[in-house]
From Swiss-Prot:
Record lineage: Bacteria, Pseudomonadati, Pseudomonadota, Gammaproteobacteria, Lysobacterales
A GO CC annotation given for this chain: cytosol
Family from the record: Belongs to the DNA mismatch repair MutS family.
Pfam families named in the record: MutS_I (PF01624), MutS_II (PF05188), MutS_III (PF05192), MutS_IV (PF05190), MutS_V (PF00488)
GO MF: ATP binding; ATP-dependent DNA damage sensor activity; damaged DNA binding; mismatched DNA binding
Protein name, as recorded: DNA mismatch repair protein MutS
Amino acid sequence: MQTADTKDKTKLSTGAAEHTPLMKQFFAAKSDYPDLLLFFRMGDFYELFYDDARKAARLLDITLTQRGSSGGAPIPMAGVPVHAYEGYLARLVALGESVAICEQIGDPALAKGLVERKVVRIVTPGTVTDEALLDERRDTLLMAISRSKQGYGLAWADLAGGRFLVNEVDSVDALEAEIARLEPAELLVPDEDNWPEFLRGRVGVRRRPPWLFDADSGRRQLLAFFKLHDLSGFGIDDKPCATAAAGALLGYVEETQKQRLPHLTSIAMEVASEAISMNAATRRHLELDTRVDGDTRNTLLGVLDSTVTPMGGRLLRRWLHRPLRLREVLVQRHHAVGSLIDTGADTDVREAFRALGDLERILTRVALRSARPRDFSTLRDGLALLPKVRTILAPLDSPRLQTLYAELGEHDATAHLLISAVAEQPPLKFSDGGVIATGYDADLDELRRLSTNADQFLIDLEQRERASSGIATLKVGYNRVHGYYIEISKGQAEKAPLHYSRRQTLTNAERYITEELKSFEDKVLSARERSLSREKLLYEGLLDALGGELEGLKRCASALSELDVLAGFAERAQALDWSQPELESAPCLHIERGRHPVVEAVRDQPFEPNDLDLHPDRRMLVITGPNMGGKSTYMRQNALIVLLAHIGSYVPASRAVIGPIDRILTRIGAGDDLARGQSTFMVEMAETSYILHHATPQSLVLMDEIGRGTSTYDGLALADAVARHLAHTNRCYTLFATHYFELTALADASHAGGGSGIANVHLDAVEHGERLVFMHAVKDGPANRSFGLQVAALAGLPKAAVQQARRRLAELEQRGGDSHAAEMAPAALDAPQQFGLFTAPSSAAQEALQALDPDELTPKQALEALYRLKALL
């Protein structure tokens, strides 16, 4: 975690006069940004010195060299070429580093001494807006956290997209869940002790002075930035902790960006109750966009993302990580998807969007006045598509699609301006010229004609000079260093006319200048400079004109993003045979022929669909069956179906009826991460504890193999207690997979006591010769075998080891009897202290009792035996 008082080890020595003028200039710039890497412009390179050079050489794998000495010591140096610096900058930002760009702001050719330099830009992981430094399908967020006795305030901004939001949470667990959801690239926290463990060592965490996180100063900063008298319109007037975080974030942005931020026009308060809650473990276990091994392939997002545009892809990721509980919003999304499917409009929309660029981020660069020439042409082409998109949407009867139709707006004037002003194929860089279209400005056209006519003049001059000099190989050319020249080979140089003045000597040629060519050069170069100057003026005018339309254009880009996501949902529904879910107000979770969307997509064989039926009288399924039989897949698929329904997507099932859901909570062992130094069992218990404390009757809980990380009896006792707590206290919807067959007795106890709605289901397997065939079908009732030894054989365990295990199993079964729950007395749910699940260990009293034959005892002998037995207890 980077601290606020970290200082660069490079210091001006007491003998500062010993340093060279260049190093004095470097130290002056570096002293203002001690915690940042300083890219110091020197000609065609950005150089780094001293500790910056050592660090950059290590991180970027570039050469560490030295540049003479200064202050009596060698100067460590490393550098990157200016023309390729963005690639190196992107790598540093991805590693959590921040960089200050120090440019030459004077003209080296005109400078009498040292050229003037100034830090003109600061690039940090959370504030980048350059296209080359961004992941086009993922938000790049800057977050600030403040804390109080009541909890934590969060503020986060997507500077590249123009979004600014806040929230408040009341616990460390909720804070960790929000950070897992948002995945900020950079995180600002007060420089204080006792921050949660999960923040320590996290890449991109910046400690800032605590006084920057003050609620009152934050409020004043927000009012000044948005030019308001109060914050009630944003809904954060009574959120001091969130306001403090927002003020700290805004201060950091203004400090690093060194310019106005006109694209941040409001701040929104996220309401936690509007979304389904998922903690960090649940997101990890369900592999929404990243697998537990860190791979991003074969995830739910990978299957679901059929968006055409980058901005649509980012919106889909946000939806996926924040499934909504707002039934009206979701029903409108489902209806919109259905309308697109029924009319075939999804195909038309997606085809039109193939010519649509990332308007959201382009508009940010327009607002920040950093837009490049091709940003203008992309925006122009995007606005030109609007009439076609509006024509597609106009006849559709979906309320949500009609809202999007209205939000698209009509931007004919802006489109016409860009069509007339921007060249059809503008260059990558403005300095190359040719950005403004011919015919847009008469003065610019005249200046360009001078440059164009210059080419013909040079052709004519070359022919005349060849004729007058008699040198057939004479050439007229130009380079940026020496300007225009007449070139004659070494062998012909003696024939050069007397009025030729030598300009440059090469190995095989001599270059000359004449008064006529010099006069022409002055005229042409002046025209080109004036042309670029005029073009820059027109370019700035376009930025001004677009700045006045930003609000409407941002709404348009937002509507296009949502339309892209909805059309993608429609495409996926048809391609994958998904159906529209039904969201009910009554409690239920009924899924017919459900499938796991990711497993089905990657399997070569047909996926075996399964049903799920949960309701107030049937809230828990105890799931048994062999390892590899599909228990975890079955649990996850139902959670993913619920999640998909709550982002507005169709779902992989023939029918899904879903009542209110407030949380999805999971404990699945495949997600164990020991990086924090906790044992597997400790992780298991911590995640289980979170679930038991947070699950409600509207929560969906997945529990996979609880108790496996400890001894058999401890594990069984814990699994039993957890199952009882979920069924009896939390009363949530629970899918409880276990290898403890004894737990299947809970269903019998539930029925006997009219209790908490527990039922048994199982997944079966069939032995076919030496092969084991997993059926993957969920059936009612408990499993009768675990097939553990068969699975071990499938995994490649040596035959001798498997045979030894079979012999040992036979011995254990003979000694202890079959401990299957069907042969055991069920434990009543209303008496959680009575397990009634274990085969009791033998004792002296038990052995003595077994030795008695009641039919052979007299009354006196029976009484004496009873006393003996009592004494043994």
